[in-house]
Amino acid sequence: DWNALPGSFALKPNRGFGGEGIIVVYGRKKNRDDAWVKANGSVITIDDLRTHIRNILDGSFSITNTPDIAFFEERLKLLKLFKPYAYKGIPDIRVIVMNKVPVMAMLRLPTKDSDGKANLQQGAIGVGIDMATGTTTTAVLGKAHIIEYVPKTRLALSGIRIPYWKDILRIAVAAQEVSELGFLGADIAIDRDRGPVILELNARPGLSIQVANLAGLKGR
């Protein structure tokens, strides 16, 4: 029953890569039961969702170019701390874990260019995090452009203290143990009411985290 969908949610491919194929909606279209509104203000209908799901099932966004699974995910509530830094979407923390040790992390902030998604390949901001203190350091816009401030503001990206930092690291390590992968990137968001929540696990977490931290994984 399409009408049973909540006012806000995310639709994702199971084996997607680089944020491709993800749709995030922020509320129902006023006076319509068959449509929702996305971050950029555009409208998406039930027919649009059906078409997108067919594309996901056909493997259009699959990293292996094979038939995939589509799933709906609840949209979390934004933590007040991140409100000035994030454009509409929910930030998350990507933690790289290798052999049960968290070795690198970054805060990912959605932007207007990324359509409210915390994905650097689509134009989000990545901010390196000091592993000992959970405090942000250097930042990158997209995949390679080093920045100091939130675009078009004087809001510094360094010096943000990540709440629940030790809990986030523990969750990331536990996720790696359960997955039985020796190396992965755990994406963890902080819900306003529930605290840290796992969004997804990535067997190929990308290279941008090294740029954001101005450091290579090999040295860790």
Model-based region annotation:
Residues 1-4:
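Short amphipathic alpha-helix with an adjacent loop that forms part of the alpha/beta core around
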Residues 94, 187-189:
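Short, surface-exposed charged micro-motifs
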Residues 149-167, 177-181, 190-220:
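C-terminal active-site "lid" helix and adjoining low-complexity regulatory extension at the edge
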Residues 22, 113-122, 208-213:
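A short, polar/proline- and glycine-enriched secondary-structure boundary/capping micro-motif
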Residues 10-53:
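Glycine-rich phosphate-binding loop of ATP-grasp-fold ATP-dependent ligases
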Residues 127-157, 168, 172-175:
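Intrinsically disordered, low-complexity Ser/Thr/Pro/Gly-rich regulatory segments
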Residues 37-141:
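Phosphate-binding site of ATP-dependent enzymes
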